[in-house]
């Protein structure tokens, strides 16, 4: 028994999601009737349940509820102004996402609204969106910029993202997504905008320390592989991690390019050819699937799940919460969509929002319940962990801890 723990949770069933404990018969890494000890914000030890515990240790009796790692939403765009409900109506009338973007809608319409928004306005709306994720047991959220596309607004977005931590007990991981769309002022010279991203904004992001990763949108309506490679080289120069939106609408070999630069993740990948999957596996890059966008855009091309499984590529799931293609502020719903729309198992879906989502963000101490890991945990009143993927808007965690602190 650990006498020096800050607190313990006794009589608890645990889905550790540890890769070393997972088997074909037990993909959740289950420890039943256990006692977990927390010290200094970390998981200190997991032992069999205790009949008696020291009176000096603060103890929670879980009554055989289930303890799971805190959920991780590893791909969001939740800092923005305005909405795109009109574009949703246009799509329902037959116009495609690409056609709307070519007419100046899409990302550019959100850019116009976001540039006009104040810091306070952006912060208040972002807190509301993040709070909806948090109430479902999300303890870490990645948030991208990309709706400013100028120096001042991009920096403001990243600062807003980080400042959410002052209002909600949640870990925020800001990502600089300058190469999201070509802004109007550069529409005649997209290469000059890429230079602006690499030579003017990225150094300031580093100087202010408000992002640890860089993302790009490699697509025919956004940036070419050549342009994305320039962003990647600049990111490597500044010591930033790489993530990439690739193969969402077409196959430009963006995933192969990202893997060449050892990207943390390649996201969307509906049009990823199975023959390109080995390159992702070799670079240990996570495949982040975004069924919310697939659903909202009524796409039909599914990610190559069979090939990803065959080559043991880690698969994550994320909300892609954004105003245009995935206005979905529910990671639990995304888990269900991953199963129903993409054919994932409930265990794969849970791995996708815990262990694999942590890997997609380069967070080696999150996403699993194991000694030495951050004490990001949720207690659920369920019969089995597969219930998280089973229903829609039915359950919420009864208790949540972030870095050992209870919400």
From Swiss-Prot:
Molecular function via GO: imidazolonepropionase activity; iron ion binding; zinc ion binding
Taxonomic source organism: Pseudoalteromonas atlantica (strain T6c / ATCC BAA-1087)
Primary localisation category: cytoplasm
Role summary: Catalyzes the hydrolytic cleavage of the carbon-nitrogen bond in imidazolone-5-propanoate to yield N-formimidoyl-L-glutamate. It is the third step in the universal histidine degradation pathway.
UniProt record, GO biological process: L-histidine catabolic process to glutamate and formamide; L-histidine catabolic process to glutamate and formate
Keywords noted in UniProt: Cytoplasm, Histidine metabolism, Hydrolase, Iron, Metal-binding, Zinc
Co-factor note (free text): Binds 1 zinc or iron ion per subunit.
Protein name as catalogued: Imidazolonepropionase
One Pfam match: Amidohydro_1
Co-factor(s): Zn(2+); Fe(3+)
Similarity comment: Belongs to the metallo-dependent hydrolases superfamily. HutI family.
Record: residues binding Fe(3+): 75, 77, 245, 320
Positions that bind N-formimidoyl-L-glutamate: 147, 322, 324
Residues engaged in binding 4-imidazolone-5-propanoate: 84, 147, 180, 248, 325
Gene (name only): hutI
């Amino acid at each position: 028994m650990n006498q020096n723990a800050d607190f313990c949770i006794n009589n608890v069933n645990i889905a550790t999601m540890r890769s070393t404990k997972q088997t074909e018969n037990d993909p959740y890494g289950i420890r039943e009737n256990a006692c977990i000890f927390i010290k200094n914000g970390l998981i200190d030890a997991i032992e069999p349940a205790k009949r008696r515990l020291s009176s000096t240790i603060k103890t929670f009796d879980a009554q055989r509820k289930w303890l799971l790692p805190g959920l991780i939403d590893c791909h969001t765009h939740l800092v923005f102004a305005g909405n795109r409900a009109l574009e949703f109506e246009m799509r329902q009338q037959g116009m495609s996402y690409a056609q709307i973007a070519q007419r100046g809608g899409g990302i550019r319409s959100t850019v116009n609204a976001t540039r006009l928004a104040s810091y306070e306005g952006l912060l208040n709306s972002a807190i509301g969106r993040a709070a909806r994720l948090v109430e479902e047991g999300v303890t870490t959220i990645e948030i991208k910029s990309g709706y400013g596309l100028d120096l001042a607004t991009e920096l403001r977005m990243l600062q807003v993202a980080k400042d959410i931590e002052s209002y909600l007990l949640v870990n925020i991981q800001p990502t600089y997504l300058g190469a999201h769309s070509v802004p109007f002022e550069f529409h005649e010279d997209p290469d000059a905008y890429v230079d602006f991203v690499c030579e003017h904004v990225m150094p300031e992001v580093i100087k202010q320390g408000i992002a640890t990763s860089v993302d790009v949108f490699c697509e025919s309506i956004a940036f070419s592989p050549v342009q994305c490679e320039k962003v990647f080289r600049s990111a490597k120069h500044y010591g930033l991690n790489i993530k990439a939106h690739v193969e969402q609408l077409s196959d430009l070999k963006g995933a192969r390019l990202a893997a060449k630069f050892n990207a943390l993740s390649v996201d969307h990948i509906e049009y990823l050819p199975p023959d390109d999957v080995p390159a992702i596996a070799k670079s240990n890059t996570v495949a982040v699937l975004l069924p919310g966008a697939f659903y909202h855009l009524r796409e039909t091309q599914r990610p190559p799940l069979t090939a990803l499984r065959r080559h043991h590529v880690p698969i994550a799931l994320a909300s892609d919460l954004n105003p245009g293609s995935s206005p979905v502020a529910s990671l639990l719903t995304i888990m269900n969509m991953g199963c129903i729309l993409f054919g994932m198992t409930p265990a794969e879906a849970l791995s996708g929002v815990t262990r694999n989502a942590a890997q997609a963000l380069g967070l080696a101490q999150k996403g699993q319940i194991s000694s030495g890991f951050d004490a990001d945990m949720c207690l659920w009143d369920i019969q089995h962990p597969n219930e998280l993927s089973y229903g829609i808007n039915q359950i919420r965690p009864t208790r949540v801890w972030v870095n050992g602190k209870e919400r």
